[in-house]
Structures are given as structure tokens and as C-alpha cells.
Amino acid sequence: MCGIWALFGSDDCLSVQCLSAMKIAHRGPDAFRFENVNGYTNCCFGFHRLAVVDPLFGMQPIRVKKYPYLWLCYNGEIYNHKKMQQHFEFEYQTKVDGEIILHLYDKGGIEQTICMLDGVFAFVLLDTANKKVFLGRDTYGVRPLFKAMTEDGFLAVCSEAKGLVTLKHSATPFLKVEPFLPGHYEVLDLKPNGKVASVEMVKYHHCRDVPLHALYDNVEKLFPGFEIETVKNNLRILFNNAVKKRLMTDRRIGCLLSGGLDSSLVAATLLKQLKEAQVQYPLQTFAIGMEDSPDLLAARKVADHIGSEHYEVLFNSEEGIQALDEVIFSLETYDITTVRASVGMYLISKYIRKNTDSVVIFSGEGSDELTQGYIYFHKAPSPEKAEEESERLLRELYLFDVLRADRTTAAHGLELRVPFLDHRFSSYYLSLPPEMRIPKNGIEKHLLRETFEDSNLIPKEILWRPKEAFSDGITSVKNSWFKILQEYVEHQVDDAMMANAAQKFPFNTPKTKEGYYYRQVFERHYPGRADWLSHYWMPKWINATDPSARTLTHYKSAVKA
């Protein structure tokens, strides 16, 4: 996890413009660099580094002697870089995984390059010989990338929007900033004056498609067919591989553990893989909650079962409320469910950074979208409609869950890794017949649970534990985070403010006092930037007015049972 920043065709003083890049310094606490492009005095790269791989020679922009005309600034991890290096017999100058991008590009061009990358990434690649600039982002948008471009060809890119909003450009007093779409790359012409012109924007990968790099994977041979035992065996193989490849780091590994199905499977598999790799330190797992929260109790059981070095972080309602302003600033969104769920993750990330030496943190993000884990999937009218909804959620992850996961950890200089969003695992899961993936017998993620039924990876009671939203599970059923927030915003937003909400906020008008409060905080930090969020996250098929699982009938009946 790092922070990247680049300008092309700036007409303002670069030393002043570079101050904007310091707004993402939290993403790279170990080192930073600014570098002008040779021959283009108005083009510049900025980089904030979190040293995870090759701490000695990992500074960016990456340049190697063999390709003096290539400049690469990227944030990500390319898990198959050694495999690609060996297969094509590339001669590396560093041990940095991103160097593979330069070699693949020289060999086959940008499309082949980006399709061969197994990992998560956001990059800016400059080819001064051919006068081209390339932008690219991974399939699910696990690594963030924002872009601002004017009609006269000024281009600015950054890992977070906050690094772009104060940039100056003579032709545009208000610079439009927008997220770069996941699963896409863009080709731009570089003009002699340093400005650019967009040539094409290409969608290179759909989450259902088996990625091109699968041809070179080390995964065990999968068995054909959709018999249940075959599918379960294939899923176990792919999930183990997804975790194993993500061990690539020179820093200590830890794992978020809420005690839910997803984080528990990740933690248990991770600990098993660390032992097989003969890593010489115990796995640290981290849980957060208020006293006697369901998550803390469940996480404790999992930690005892797998034998991790477990940490419990307690917080109270006052600490949660006080964190809201910092959280919304870090997130760059006012989406209700994203803000709610981010408070716990933000506070636990803060604890990890201050009190431990774990830097690379695993989590269970992405599973709910992939495996139809949200409670409202019980109401899907058909397996096909459930499949469509699952794919929609995956397409929009970059606006919600992976945004939350990235910003709350990056705010404290941590790197998050998400095995459930592995290309091979997710594409295989989505290839299964729709009827195999829907909730069964009143239980969501039935196939995933059944897959690990006989593995003894985690306790049975955790394997079959009903779905809890992270923002709900960190507090008690009697006094949920949802309820605490409602009581707080009731004193912050009055009825007159709500009556005038449509006039004050005509775009994405908040419908609740909680939504109004978050929007107020967001506008204070990012005035006029409401379009960064295209729509609120909301359950489907149930006419919900609030995204909390605690408000759903299925959840209430499950609690009573």
C-alpha cells in the first residue's frame, strides 16, 4: 500500500502543486519522493512509500536501465511477478513486484500487460519514447485511483481524491475529480507541451471471466463438473491458493477477526499457510467492539481454536462518535452504511499501528458480495436475479466496501489484503450454477459454509453463525451502533433542517437525520464534491429505508430464535 500522485501539463508552479500530494502522506509513512520528468518541466510524479517488498530498492517512480524511457508509479501488489519473470526470462534490476509491468509492457504492450497481472493495483505508466501515458486499475478497484482532466489537456491522478481537490489550473477554477473505473485502462497521447489527450478507455476484464494470467498459475489442477463434492474441493484449492499468494511481504502479517464466517476462514487459513511457510512469528489477530459485543465473543472462540496471538480492542459510544469526523474525511464519502461500518475498522487500524508491528493486514472483505452473504438475498425472486445482484455489488465495491477497507487502514499506514477477491477464486465462484450460490434452508453463504464443513478450520458454531453486519456486531443487540448513532444525530439535526434537505442537498438528498449529518460533515471537508458518490448503498427487494441488518425482518426473527 502506497500513495501515488502525478501531474501532466501543469501551468502552475510545481513546487506549490506538490503540496497537494502531501495530503496522502499517511499512505506511505516510510519515505516520499517527487521527481520531474526529463524534457517535460510541467510533468511530475509524487510517491509516498509503505515499504512492504524490497525495502532497499523500492522507491518510485520505478525506472530501470533497460528502459530509460519508461516511468512507472504504482500502488499495489503483483502476486505472480516471480512466475512471470521466470516464464519470460526477464532480467530484473530490483526485487520490486511492480517492475514486471515495465518488462511485460515492453514485450507485449499495455493490454497484454494489464491482463497478465495477478494482483491489486493502480498505476500511471509513462512512455516518453512513444509519447504515451497509461492509467490502469485492478478488476475490483481494491487499490484506489482518482483522476482530474481538463479540456485543454491538464491531467492529474492520485490515490485519493483529497490529493487533487486543491490543485490549480488556469483554465478551470473548479477541477472535476472522479474515481478511475476498476477493470479499465486508459491510453493518452503525451503532447510536446506536456499536456495529454485521451485516446481510448478500455474495459479489460470482467469479474466472471477467467483471467489471462491463469495460464501461468501454480494452482493445483481443478476438477471439471458441478457435482457438489467437486465444487467444494475446487473452492478449497482456490481459497488456499488465494491466501498463500498474498503472503508476499517483508513486513509482519496480521489479520482482522470479527468472529464472522469470512474473517474466521481467512484467519484460520492464513495461520495454516504461515506455519507451512515456516514464518517465525505468531499470527496476530485483532477484534474490536464494545463490551460484550457478539463479535468480541465470537472472535475469541476462533482465536482460541486456531491458536493466534489475539488482541481485543474496546471502544465506547463516545469514542465512536468522536471518530466520525476523521472517518468521513478519510473515506471521502457520506454513504450511510460505509460510514457506520468504517468507525470500528478505523479505530482498530489506529490501534494496530500504534501498538503492534503488524503492517500487512488480511481481512474478509468481498465475500458478502461474491457469495450472496447479505441477508436481503433471502428475498431474491430467483437464482438468476440473485446472480445479477451479486455481480452488481461486485462492480460497485470500489464505491463502498473496498473503499472503506482501503481508507480506514491506509489512514494509519497499513496495507490490507483481501483473499476473497482473488481473480481465480472469484471467477470460479461466479461460474457456478446460480442455484448453487443462493441461500439455502434460511442460511446465507450456504455453499461457502458447506465447503469447509469437514475441515475443522474454525468452530462449527462460527461456521454456521448467522450474518452480522460489522457495524452491528461490534455492539450489543440491546444497544446497537445503529441505535447509538440515531440518538446522537437526533440532537444534531432538527426537523426544520430535514424539511429543507432537498433544497440544501439537491443531489443524493439525505432521507434520514443520520444521512443528513454525514452529508454535512462531508461538505465541510469536500464542498461541492457530492457526485463522488453516485448513489447510497441500500438492500434490494425489501423496500428498506435503512441499510442496517438490524432493521430487517429476517434478522429480527433470527435473533429471537
Curated annotation (Swiss-Prot):
InterPro entries, alphabetized: Asn_synth_AEB, Asn_synthase, Asn_Synthetase, AsnB_N, GATase_2_dom, Ntn_hydrolases_N, Rossmann-like_a/b/a_fold
Gene name tied to this protein: ASNS
Entry protein name: Asparagine synthetase [glutamine-hydrolyzing]
Residue positions binding L-glutamine: R49, L50, A51, V52, V53, N75, G76, E77, D97
Chain positions with N6-acetyllysine modification: K385
Residues modified to Phosphothreonine: T545
Record site: Important for beta-aspartyl-AMP intermediate formation: E365
Pathology noted in the entry: Asparagine synthetase deficiency: An inborn error of asparagine biosynthesis that results in a severe neurologic disorder characterized by microcephaly, severely delayed psychomotor development, progressive encephalopathy, cortical atrophy, and seizure or hyperekplexic activity.
One annotated GO molecular function: asparagine synthase (glutamine-hydrolyzing) activity
Residues of the active site: C2 (for gatase activity)
Catalytic activity: L-aspartate + L-glutamine + ATP + H2O = L-asparagine + L-glutamate + AMP + diphosphate + H(+)
Annotated binding of ATP, by residue: L256, I288, S363, G364
